């Protein structure tokens, strides 16, 4: 199973990069122990279109080409999505890791949100918080929760009840 994070925009702030890379390295160390053969980060350039809806649609068109739709589970992050506790998030991830698909995609739209087309291909829409998070903070927060969930799955002491 491949686990992928697809995001509109690139991390350019060194403080975010440092924290993001910390969790990325930790995930790579343990991913094979839970059946993840590859962990990939896919960054899509933001569209320069002036119209918000057109911009989101253009970003979707680039992003969807990076997804193997028939053989993937697509989890969209959206502030209106379902909220999870850490244990519920771990259970969702564990469920999808046992599906007969080749990849799980966590998708973060651009700063203006996600197009309706992107929302339609999502198998699940989740929210990391009831609060609005900055785009880059959402990425870091997702990476931490992925690492935490994977740690729970292998009984690593990172997560404490």
Could you say what each language-model-derived stretch is?
Residues 112, 116-160:
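Structured adenosyl-cofactor binding patch, chiefly the S-adenosyl-L-methionine
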Residues 36-103:
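S-adenosyl-L-methionine/SAH cofactor-binding core of RNA-modifying enzymes
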Residues 17, 53, 86-90, 119, ...:
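Conserved strand-to-helix beginnings and helix N-cap segments that scaffold or border functional pockets
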Residues 5, 75, 109, 142:
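Conserved RecA-like P-loop NTPase ATPase core
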Residues 11, 79-82, 110-113:
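Short glycine-rich anion-binding loops that position phosphate/pyrophosphate groups of nucleotides
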């Amino acid at each position: 199973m491949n686990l992928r994070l697809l995001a509109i925009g690139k991390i350019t702030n060194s403080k975010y990069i440092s924290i993001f890379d910390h969790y990325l390295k930790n995930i790579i160390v343990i991913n094979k122990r839970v059946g993840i053969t590859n962990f990939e980060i896919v960054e899509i350039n933001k569209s320069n279109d002036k119209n918000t809806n057109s911009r989101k649609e253009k970003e979707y068109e680039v992003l969807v080409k990076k997804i193997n739709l028939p053989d993937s589970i697509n989890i969209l992050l959206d502030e209106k999505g379902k909220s999870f506790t850490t244990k519920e998030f771990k259970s969702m991830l564990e469920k999808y890791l046992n599906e007969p698909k080749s990849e799980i995609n966590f998708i973060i739209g651009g700063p203006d949100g996600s197009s309706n087309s992107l929302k339609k291909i999502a198998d699940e829409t989740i929210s990391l918080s009831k609060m609005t998070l900055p785009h880059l903070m959402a990425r870091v927060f997702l990476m931490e929760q992925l690492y935490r969930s994977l740690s729970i799955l292998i009984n690593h002491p990172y997560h404490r009840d």
